[in-house]
Amino acid sequence: MIDATHTANVLVQALPYIQRFAGRSVLVKLGGAALDAELDRALAQDVLLLRSVGMRVVLVHGGGPQVDDMMRRLGMKPEFRDGLRVTTAETLEVVRMVLVGKINRDLVGTINREAAEEPVAVGVSGEDGGLLTVTPRESSLGFVGDVSMVRASVLDRLLDEGLTPVVSTIGADEGGQPYNVNADEAARAIAVAMGAEKIVYLTAAPGLLEDPADEDSLIHRLTSAELYEKIEHQSVSRGMIPKLRACAEAVDAGVGTAHIIDGRVPHALLIELLTDEGIGTMIRREKNW
């Protein structure tokens, strides 16, 4: 009886959030460091539940550690410059193979196996339908591009058909040449183009920490201005800066809220979006909690 009462209380707490976000777009970015078979299954269940209550969920994934692993298995050495992967033509082929041919297919398969009836997830590369048009970064990085345009209608049409897009972040220039795109930046660009209500980054950290060495120092809420100040004063871990900057830019460009949560915690997405306390860090443009 106690368990049943607790379950009822959880559902009652979730109801206002379900009503508020029904019909709204939610962009979920899954980092390569948070990819794990059991966690992917829990994430699939979360995505399906959010979809079932009317949210329009788009999943964007990275895969850096998996690309590194494949490169080493092929006798190649990963190279980075200012946190970005130097992407030669040979490296680009490995990136496409891992992101599009392996991780994307695995995530789509996991979601569809968890679906109660017919499959609902569909894999999409940024190359498909001109979803991500990119311009090259500096030539020393090779085939690394910045998103210059998002054709959000590609995703909107899939969502309108009741499908859940799973996006791998390979884009192409206007001539059709593929480029490697930073997944955090691609997720931000897609969320802004879609007019998303929320963008959620699932990471291998609890969220933004006041003290990077203390996982109990989680910052639960802050504004984009406060976030920029922390980045400027280098009071955050260096590896989090691209995600933090993407969050601030997203909310400043019209996304309702940005969230950084611990993707290692099963069902972290539901806890963050459908409970009062949440589980990670939430960023808004204005301080109207």
Language-model segment annotations:
Residues 280:
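A residue-level signal for beta-strand positions that form part of recognition/binding surfaces
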Residues 1-264, 271-273, 277, 285-289:
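Nucleotide/pyrophosphate-binding catalytic subdomain
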